[in-house]
């Protein structure tokens, strides 16, 4: 099939994304396989692009790296970044040394759009800012209160400012487009209440309640620390078909040793834990996260932060049922989540905190307003206009279009965001453990007996167990060394030798000290006694679930 234009200055619909994925797989059949891991509520495929070189060995015998995107419908920049990762790996194979090495030695599992139903709703006017996963039309899951609706018919969901003497807001004196908070004890002005645009179900004439949506927030639908009280958590863990398909993919590929889930927004690289402080985590694992995170910060400018410590304003209300806690706390996989794009930093606002729900002063709002008006035009800002609301009476509708400002960058900035974040993920992938048979010697002892000695080592940055929590949970498989003999027999020592775990370079960040982290072994020898009468061949295999499989063959006689 012909290759459509693949540009990284726009956001693609499901059909457009599917067309490009199929074209990339068709253009690179020796490296890429496109499959569907499941279907959404509305019957759309959840696509998986697997990238690797089968000529260099089976995929499950290589370290795997996993990327997913758009688990939340409105996070369109994430899907673009995952598509960029696919495009970058395929089009740079044979041209870029690092890409070629990674594709030859590892395998990539990339899910560019986990939530195709919600994404499709969010991409079309009126650009719903929260769509769940399409189980419900936005608002249909709410029993009463404010329902998102484009009541003025301009094609955008924005804000309603409602005159109210009890209101929390007032218009800025210097820029009436901006709403500033009413100060404690302030009286005597024109005040407003600010609501998302919509109508009110079962309105009592007084209150405008806003219910949390029930529709699936799939990043609260995973087994670890799952709670039904989390908004969008589903009826039980993995109740949502897309989340269940993701979980099956991860469980079916035990070679996955690194992960990144793309989100928007905030311009940060997130690490575990979602539910506990650093003091309750493995210090060695935290050091691992920080060192790999430094590489991400150098490439993207995004700081690496703990979700619990730095991204949870109320420690009594932690996020439960997240993908990252499941993959790290249960399986020990070094997992990151990147919040792409930071409007405020781009607009010149100094970073004060990592979580975005906090009051903005007038100066901050003015900087953001100026940037949005200059760079996003009517798609980012809707001028306030009078409207006679059927329930609230005279209101004004307008303001920031959050989905095309705070949640997603303008097209002219998108490609650089994609590029730098994908480069970080490739560095993370390259940190995988890599088990090799470094040497294989055969010493003749006479009478057809031979002593076979091999040295098995880990050439990677990460240990073969990946993390301390993997050992604590008893899920880290040991490195195995085995021998096969063609034309002879094994005389002494087991056919399969359990070598335990092999450390990576990460332990040795500074010269040895009795007060520092003590070093574990990165290599181990193994010996066998074999008998071969005449000519034969021996093959020694080093196998690690996370660090790959390597074989060395030697002829005897």
Positions of predicted regions on the chain:
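Metallocarboxypeptidase
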Residues: 33-34, 68, 109-111, 117, ...
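C-terminal beta-sandwich/jelly-roll accessory domains of carbohydrate-active enzymes
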Residues: 451-557
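Short HxH-centered metal-ligating active-site micro-motif
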Residues: 43, 61-82, 113, 262-263
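Short helix-loop-beta-strand segments that form the rim/entrance of peptidase-like active sites
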Residues: 78-124
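Short glycine- and acidic-rich boundary segments immediately preceding or forming the N-terminal edge
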Residues: 1-47, 416
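Acidic carboxylate motifs that coordinate Ca2+ or other divalent cations, activating on Asp/Glu
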Residues: 150, 154
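Short beta-strand-to-loop junctions in surface cap/lid or active-site-entrance loops
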Residues: 48-58, 70
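Soluble secreted/lumenal catalytic domains
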Residues: 22-26, 50, 237, 255
